[in-house]
Amino acid sequence: MGGEDMAKKKAPSAKEGEKQQGFKEIIPEVTEKLVEQARKEVARERWVTPHKLAQKMGVKVSIARRVLRILEEEGVLVLFTRNRRSPLYLPKKKVPTAPPRGL
């Protein structure tokens, strides 16, 4: 009766197939290509967080966090501040300097 109809699996529609193609590519590890792409993205920004970089590059936040640490070690970025959630990085050339004392 009705059980036979429920046992049949629904064939995926064209729209569902399109949705599956829209998923982000899963990159399990940090590659040199990914670091180079991030270096170009960071150079254009005034500041960057792991979330902001993840959105721009289409990767997970954990991967973006690792990439930012690598760029900090290379001297491309400077850790400006860290709160309980995410660090804020500045490109090395855009780090604010304090005015001289006594002026």
Swiss-Prot record:
<keyword id="KW-0687">Ribonucleoprotein</keyword>
<dbReference type="InterPro" id="IPR036390">
    <property type="entry name" value="WH_DNA-bd_sf"/>
</dbReference>
<feature type="region of interest" description="Disordered">
    <location>
        <begin position="1"/>
        <end position="23"/>
    </location>
</feature>
<comment type="similarity">
    <text>Belongs to the eukaryotic ribosomal protein eS25 family.</text>
</comment>
<protein>
    <recommendedName>
        <fullName>Small ribosomal subunit protein eS25</fullName>
    </recommendedName>
</protein>
<dbReference type="Pfam" id="PF03297">
    <property type="entry name" value="Ribosomal_S25"/>
</dbReference>
<dbReference type="GO" id="GO:0005840">
    <property type="term" value="C:ribosome"/>
</dbReference>
<dbReference type="InterPro" id="IPR036388">
    <property type="entry name" value="WH-like_DNA-bd_sf"/>
</dbReference>
<dbReference type="GO" id="GO:1990904">
    <property type="term" value="C:ribonucleoprotein complex"/>
</dbReference>
<dbReference type="InterPro" id="IPR004977">
    <property type="entry name" value="Ribosomal_eS25"/>
</dbReference>
<keyword id="KW-0689">Ribosomal protein</keyword>
